[in-house]
């Protein structure tokens, strides 16, 4: 399983420790950024989210993981890419349910929240999400999301 990971400057230090711990356990991770906590953000979260989303949609990676300060910006940006179902979670049960029920393909979270829980807890949430499976019980909902992906809206 190949994972595509990304973060913005707000999450950099915690994220890098998390990636190192995941790699030490044998996970194949492509890290698409960022490169420093000193980078000016200026929308960096959106660029990183798009890069991860594109790699997931293209099949270059099986799943994505995004982290910023809260996870909110990353989830919003990733969900702009058609076909992406980015989910925002801070705990194991919502992470599992987001895969079981909603077939999430990118997990987002916030470093500011997860630092308090620690690396091990964050890894347990990611692993629980990765090894959960879509149950197929919400096919109507998945079809509705696909229609939204295909629909064009006029921005006012």
Model-derived regions, located:
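C-terminal binding/interaction regions
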Residues: 2-13, 92-156
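Short, conserved beta-strand edge motifs with alternating hydrophobic and charged residues
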Residues: 6, 30-33, 64-68
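Short, solvent-exposed amphipathic alpha-helices that sit
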Residues: 13-25
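Short, structured coil segments at secondary-structure junctions
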Residues: 25, 81-82, 102
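A short beta-strand-loop structural module common to alpha/beta enzyme folds
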Residues: 28-41
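Structural motif
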Residues: 40-50
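Helix-adjacent hinge/juxtasegments
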Residues: 48-88
């Amino acid at each position: 399983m190949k994972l595509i990971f990304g973060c913005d400057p707000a999450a950099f230090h915690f994220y890098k420790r998390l990636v190192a711990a995941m790699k030490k356990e044998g996970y194949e991770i492509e890290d698409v950024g960022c490169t420093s906590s000193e980078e000016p953000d200026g929308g960096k979260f959106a660029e990183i989210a798009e890069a991860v989303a594109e790699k997931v949609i293209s099949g270059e990676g099986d799943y994505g993981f995004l982290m910023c300060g809260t996870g909110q910006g990353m989830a919003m940006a990733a969900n702009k890419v058609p076909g992406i179902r980015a989910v925002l979670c801070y705990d194991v049960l919502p992470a599992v349910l987001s895969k079981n029920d909603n077939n999430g393909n990118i997990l987002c979270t916030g470093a500011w929240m997860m630092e308090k829980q620690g690396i091990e807890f964050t890894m347990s949430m990611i692993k629980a999400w990765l090894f959960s499976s879509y149950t197929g019980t919400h096919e109507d909902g998945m079809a509705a999301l696909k229609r939204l992906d295909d629909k064009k809206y006029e921005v006012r």
